[in-house]
């Protein structure tokens, strides 16, 4: 492996921020202290795509994102600045929403199984390819040698039509069938990404397909790309085999995988540096949450909302809904592999619901499969016979049924948990994050240290993250929300007022919105909150959903947001609570930032998060970043800034930690907790990475109520200098002195 970058900085490349634009900010990133430019997908994607995860041609750089010239400019700028380049790749699927834009899919639609690209896609060839694009007025036409439906165009098989032929008759002669868009979830004939019918699964298990789809990736490596981020490996038939092929293609690259690990789960033994950091995010988030607040938070939530379900029960319901409504075609395809098993579809679905992690990697993960089988039978004893018959096949790595089930369970977990249950279960939404368990109310200090020692020993080169393009809410939103675990009466007063105003609305969702208002704050652009609320309530899929919108209910929810702005009493309560949350929220934000930047692993800074940020789920977290303002503020920093609304303190902490990791990597080779004694000991996170010692304040409200640090002492040995404040210390130091100007410290010998 090449020397991994000391840190990365994620840039979202798109038409409005191209590779040329990225090249223009490389100098700023160098000054910030970043070690590598980390790019979102840059291969040719669907026209207008803002994210790039819908690649249409994996063999060329996206024209709208800067094309080959922009790519060359970015590489040159990074090389001149001494920065490495890391690229996000998407092997699991290709975008097919505009069939003509994907030449490989177009050819398959044209020639069917005889297409040279037929092996690229995971298609059920027992029937025509299902294309769910039609509305209620399925009026087709033939124009310019293509089948047309409004703006959609589809190819015609050679010899399948003649001038004057009836379009419906021509349609019947094709290798595909256009059907109503509502039929896709139940009738789709190809594997897709989660529930997105416009993202067709790619058969990377075929060596020829891997080689063909990775030619541009291989040339990127030859051009100097140092690292790869692999999107959604769990969608592949055999992620481990894929990673082995990728490691042979790029033997010196730093490779991380977007593998979502459940609490306690370990990454399989793949030839990768580690994950993309959601596991680290869960640990950092958790240690800033007051475990002692759980009982009160649970009681308050149940009393105000009437929601008596646990997180586990919400996840079960979410998964069941996803399988009943959306992943029907996937379940049917698997059940079709066991035609002699009565209730095979119900049994397959029940095991997927019961699966406690995203998926197994047979023969690894048998214990998780066995647990799921037992739980499935307990929940549905009438399926015992079907489960017993299917069990040997589900355990067989060579059985297509087992392979497809493993792909199904990951989609079920993601859609049922992150995209459904996390929008329904609103006890404490700071915990409702990718890779986290909403039922796990924080992480204790000793457990946090133990987890970092495991990380240092097992995956010291794994990525760590606080915010990504996929997080449910940004890092500082979660930092502010964490304060609510320490505020009882004050938080309840506002939450109760919001719920009371939610006439005709789901009380739990109103409670969810009340927390969102605290996490984001009184932003000037309330339309952001309206857009977020629309997405959140439709993802929850209770009173309203994407495919069955209840306009009256949605108007009521949006009116509740307007009340927070326009009703004097509610606005006053909101602002009073925000005033209480502000300073401890800043403390949490600085603490978690420094911890993430200095803990074992390679830290990533998501674009713009070196200043305070208030982002919510995508697309809100892909808003433009004002790099000119960040460059100006960075240049103005000459010493320790005040902690205030400017965000200068966060920028100072970020750049100081990044520069130290870049310039003195030898200080970050181990992990050991540093003893803290005194009345405030549980409010300090302190660890030594081998010469770089981090101290961060946790649970700041409780600390203030106890009178501050008092007699609390950090057990230093010898001489140290805090690179954040410039102050030097020799031997044990009072935290009241060490943390007098900032709630964090970064000491070096």
Segments and roles (model prediction):
Residues 1-47, 55, 59-64, 72, ...:
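Carbohydrate-interacting/catalytic domains
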Residues 12, 227-232:
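Short catalytic-loop micro-motif centered on adjacent basic/acidic residues
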Residues 47-51, 97-98:
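Short glycine-biased active-site loop of nucleotidyltransferases that positions the nucleotide triphosphate
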Residues 93, 236-237:
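Catalytic P-loop NTPase motifs of RecA-like helicase/translocase cores
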Residues 356:
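An anion/pyrophosphate-binding glycine-rich loop and adjacent beta-alpha core
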């Amino acid at each position: 492996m090449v020397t991994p970058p000391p840190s990365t900085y994620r840039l979202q490349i798109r038409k409005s921020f191209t590779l040329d634009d990225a090249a223009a900010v490389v100098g700023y990133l160098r000054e910030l202290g970043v070690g590598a430019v980390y790019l979102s997908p840059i291969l040719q994607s669907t026209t207008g795509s803002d994210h790039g995860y819908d690649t249409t041609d994996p063999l060329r750089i996206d024209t709208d994102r800067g094309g080959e010239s922009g790519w060359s400019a970015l590489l040159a700028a990074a090389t001149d600045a001494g920065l490495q380049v890391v690229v996000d790749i998407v092997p699991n699927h290709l975008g097919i929403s505009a069939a003509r834009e994907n030449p490989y899919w177009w050819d398959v639609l044209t020639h069917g199984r005889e297409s040279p690209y037929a092996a690229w896609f995971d298609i059920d060839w027992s029937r025509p390819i299902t294309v769910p694009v039609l509305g209620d007025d399925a009026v087709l036409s033939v124009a310019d040698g293509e089948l047309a439906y409004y703006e959609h165009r589809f190819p015609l098989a050679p010899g399948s039509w003649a001038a004057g032929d009836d379009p419906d008759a021509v349609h019947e002669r094709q290798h595909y069938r256009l059907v109503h868009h509502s039929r896709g979830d139940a009738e789709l004939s190809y594997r897709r990404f989660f529930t997105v019918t416009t993202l067709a699964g790619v058969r990377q298990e075929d060596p020829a397909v891997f080689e063909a789809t990775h030619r541009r990736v291989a040339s990127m490596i030859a051009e100097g790309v140092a690292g790869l981020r692999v999107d959604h490996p769990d969608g592949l038939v055999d992620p481990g085999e894929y990673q082995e092929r990728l490691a042979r293609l790029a033997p010196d690259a730093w490779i991380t995988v977007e593998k979502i690990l459940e609490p306690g789960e370990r990454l399989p033994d793949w030839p990768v540096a580690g994950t993309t950091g959601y596991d680290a995010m869960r640990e950092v988030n958790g240690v800033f949450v007051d475990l002692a607040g759980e009982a009160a938070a649970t009681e308050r939530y149940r009393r105000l909302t009437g929601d008596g379900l646990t997180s586990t029960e919400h996840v079960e319901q979410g998964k069941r809904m996803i399988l009943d409504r959306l992943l029907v075609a996937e379940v049917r395809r698997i059940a079709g592999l066991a035609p002699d098993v009565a209730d095979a579809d119900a049994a397959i679905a029940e095991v997927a619901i019961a699966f406690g992690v995203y998926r197994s990697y047979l023969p690894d993960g048998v214990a998780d499969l066995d647990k799921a089988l037992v739980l499935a039978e307990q929940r549905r004893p009438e399926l015992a016979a079907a489960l017993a018959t299917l069990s040997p096949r589900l355990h067989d790595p060579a059985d297509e049924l087992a392979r497809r089930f493993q792909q199904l369970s990951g989609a079920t977990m993601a859609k049922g948990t992150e995209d459904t249950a996390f929008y329904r279960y609103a006890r404490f939404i700071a915990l409702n994050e990718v890779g986290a368990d909403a039922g796990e109310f924080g992480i204790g200090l000793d457990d946090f240290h133990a987890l970092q020692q495991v990380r240092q020993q097992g995956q010291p080169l794994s990525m760590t993250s606080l915010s990504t393009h996929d997080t449910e809410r940004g890092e500082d939103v979660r930092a502010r929300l964490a304060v609510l675990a320490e505020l009882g009466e004050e938080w309840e007063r506002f939450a109760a007022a919001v719920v009371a105003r939610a006439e005709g609305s789901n009380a739990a969702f109103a409670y969810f919105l009340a927390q969102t208002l605290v996490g984001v704050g009184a932003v000037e652009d309330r339309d952001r909150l309206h857009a977020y609320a629309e997405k959140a309530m439709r993802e929850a899929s209770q009173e309203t959903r994407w495919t069955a919108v209840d306009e009256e209910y949605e108007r009521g929810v949006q009116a509740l947001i307007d009340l927070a702005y326009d009703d004097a009493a509610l606005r006053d309560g909101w602002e009073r609570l925000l005033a209480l949350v502000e300073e401890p929220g800043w403390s949490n934000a600085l603490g978690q930032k420094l911890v993430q930047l200095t803990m074992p692993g390679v830290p990533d800074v998501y674009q713009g998060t070196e200043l305070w940020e208030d982002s919510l789920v995508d697309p809100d977290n892909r808003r433009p970043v004002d790099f000119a303002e960040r460059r100006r503020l960075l240049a103005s920093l000459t010493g320790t800034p005040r902690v205030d609304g400017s965000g200068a303190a966060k920028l100072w902490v970020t750049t100081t930690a990044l520069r130290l990791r870049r310039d003195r990597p030898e200080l970050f080779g181990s992990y050991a907790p540093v003893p803290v004694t005194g009345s405030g000991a549980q409010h300090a996170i302190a660890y030594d990475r081998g010469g770089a010692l981090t101290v961060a304040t946790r649970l700041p409200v409780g600390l203030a109520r106890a009178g501050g640090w008092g007699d609390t002492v950090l057990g230093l040995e010898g001489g140290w200098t805090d690179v954040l404040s410039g102050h030097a210390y020799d031997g044990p130091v009072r935290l009241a002195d060490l943390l007098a100007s900032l709630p964090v410290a970064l000491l070096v010998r």
